[in-house]
Each structure stands twice: as structure tokens, then as C-alpha cells.
């Protein structure tokens, strides 16, 4: 084998190694919970920016000694969407009224439990209603969205509930619906300030 062929072989091996490293990095990034949560946040922020809506991230509302955490809150003239984000790439199992659900990690196969996002969301939104009531804010349409934000190919959903169980792509389709453009007279700035005033 002459020097030219050795050089070509060496370059080919380097390219193969770089391709493998890049593929592994992209796979890790696609299944990283922080990256997955940020994708949902980015989707909501882009949607909000075009409409002068607001997005609050990682908010813990407190009132009368109780706390309610929200991954994302979208506030618009239509009302408020409280978003719970389950960011792990896993298979999720659960029933609407069970206290906990089960998830099986797609990489390790390890089984763990997570708090039922449906009942947790109901309690959290009830606390926000009490904050609004104390401040004479009524008639705001509020919804709770659960987004399974993990890698689409590595996430399976077997959770039964009366509210939608969304993947990231489902969230985008949902936000395209006309109801998110309807002006129901919500004062976006006032609601955002009220939530921030009661946040940790």
C-alpha cells in the first residue's frame, strides 16, 4: 500500500469516527430532558411573540401557604394555558385518578414513578383561581396541557385522561386552532403581573 492509499484510508477512518461521534451527540441531545423542555418553551415563545402574548417559565405560584409549580404558562387574549412538561424520553403509563404513574426509561429500561400531572395540574390551577378571585379577576378561560416532550421516536404514551396528552408536534397543531386567536378581553399584562406578584 503506497502513501496516497494510506492517507485516503486514514481520512476515511477519521470521517467514519467523526460521523459516529456526531450521531451519538445528536441522539443524546434529542433525548436530553433539558433540551426537550427548551424545545417546548421555544415553541410557545415563538407563538406568543407573533401575537403579543406572554410566556412565563418555571413559575411557582404561592398563596395562603400553598404552592403550585408550572413549567410554562402561556397568557393571551384568549385566556391562559398552563403547561406541564414531561421531558424524559420514556414509556409513560398511568390512569387519570391514580396518585402516581410509571415511566420506563428508553435508554436504561429503568422503571420509576412520577406524580400524576392531571391531578397535580387541577390543584395548581385551583390555587391560581383563588389568587384571581382575591384580586377580583373572573371569567378567564384556563386550560391545563400535558406535553410529553421527549424524543418522538423514544417516547410512548399509555396515560389515560380526560385532558389531551400531547407530543411536541401535537402542541404545535393545537396552537394553530382558531380558539387561541379569539379575543376574550383578557388583559395580558395585568394577568402576567398578578402571577409574577404571587411567584416565588
Indicate residue ranges for each PLM-predicted region:
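Surface-exposed interaction regions that form or flank ligand-binding interfaces
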Residues: 1-68, 74-96, 101-200
Amino acid at each position: 500500500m503506497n502513501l496516497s492509499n494510506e492517507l485516503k484510508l486514514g481520512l476515511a477512518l477519521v470521517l467514519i469516527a467523526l460521523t459516529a461521534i456526531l450521531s451519538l451527540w445528536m441522539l443524546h441531545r434529542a433525548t436530553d430532558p433539558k433540551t426537550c423542555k427548551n424545545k417546548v418553551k421555544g415553541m410557545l415563545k415563538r407563538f406568543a411573540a407573533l401575537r403579543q402574548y406572554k410566556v412565563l417559565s418555571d413559575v411557582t405560584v404561592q398563596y395562603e401557604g400553598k404552592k403550585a409549580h408550572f413549567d410554562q404558562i402561556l397568557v393571551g387574549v384568549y385566556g391562559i394555558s398552563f403547561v406541564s412538561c414531561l421531558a424524559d424520553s420514556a414509556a409513560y403509563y398511568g390512569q387519570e385518578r391514580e396518585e402516581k404513574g410509571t415511566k420506563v426509561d428508553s435508554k436504561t429500561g429503568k422503571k420509576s414513578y412520577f406524580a400524576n400531572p392531571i391531578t397535580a395540574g387541577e390543584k395548581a390551577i385551583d390555587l391560581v383561581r383563588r389568587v384571581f378571585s382575591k384580586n377580583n379577576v373572573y371569567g378567564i378561560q384556563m386550560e391545563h396541557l400535558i406535553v410529553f416532550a421527549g424524543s418522538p421516536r423514544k417516547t410512548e404514551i399509555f396515560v389515560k385522561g380526560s385532558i389531551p396528552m400531547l407530543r411536541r408536534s401535537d402542541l404545535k397543531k393545537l396552537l394553530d386552532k382558531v380558539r387561541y386567536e379569539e379575543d376574550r378581553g383578557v388583559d395580558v399584562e395585568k394577568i402576567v403581573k398578578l402571577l409574577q406578584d404571587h411567584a416565588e
